[in-house]
């Protein structure tokens, strides 16, 4: 492939990224990392991928602990997080962790998004532990996440913006550190979102996967979206999400042991418990949610 060519140079790298940006997609951070991974020794990718696989559950646990206001060394949090990830469908885990392109665009960007949120969570839930030096890793992580996957960029920017507004409402002051990270995230996401290649890629994807897409009504779009969300939960992501919900239950129980009298804890624990049970329904032979979205081709008949 062109990426592996021994004649590739820094000039060609810029040409390659420019070609991808103009003709296919705006995911420049992911494309650049893929380029470097293919041009380097395979062990570079293996080491970084292993690091990302470790940092993903660690980051999720840290965010959950900050949100719950609990610091714990309970091993069950780690077991729930890691097991939920590694027990996902073999194809899903393979695409996200073992396949080079997939790991870079999905696992790496998701991990970077999680770690970009660490200082945001500190400012919102645990201000005294926020350190400005966190920006040295958070901002690069925000750039990678928001310039690798559209959904991650949108979610990250939304959470950062909500944090800015919340801190102003609560403290009547603006955190310039958070504003800086939010501005960088917005700029990186704009670079991705405004890529000329996006329109070409969308046209190609529509032709290949759903030719009737342009003629769908708003209701049909909404129906498909709901079906795919449920299908994604009930098939690919059920155990990963179940692991996260179990972490939430464990942390809220610990908070209650520490003397918390917040009645909403019981409500959130109840919701998390319900979703955890629902995620296990396919193992009991109940596939009503797993089957949703599987035969979406006849959407025009709805």
Predicted feature locations:
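Transmembrane-helix motifs of polytopic, lipid-linked glycan transferases
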Residues: 50-77, 115
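Single conserved hydrophobic/aromatic residue that forms the stacking wall/gate
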Residues: 1-8, 12
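Membrane-interface micro-motifs in multi-pass membrane enzymes
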Residues: 74-124, 282-302
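Short hydrophobic/aromatic helix or loop-helix immediately within or flanking a transmembrane segment
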Residues: 19-43, 47-50
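Membrane-interface alpha helices of multi-pass inner-membrane proteins
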Residues: 133-156, 161
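Short hydrophobic alpha-helices at membrane interfaces in multi-pass membrane enzymes
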Residues: 122-144, 176-179
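Hydrophobic, aromatic-rich transmembrane alpha-helices
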Residues: 56-62, 168, 238-265
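Perimembrane helix-loop-helix junctions
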Residues: 155-186
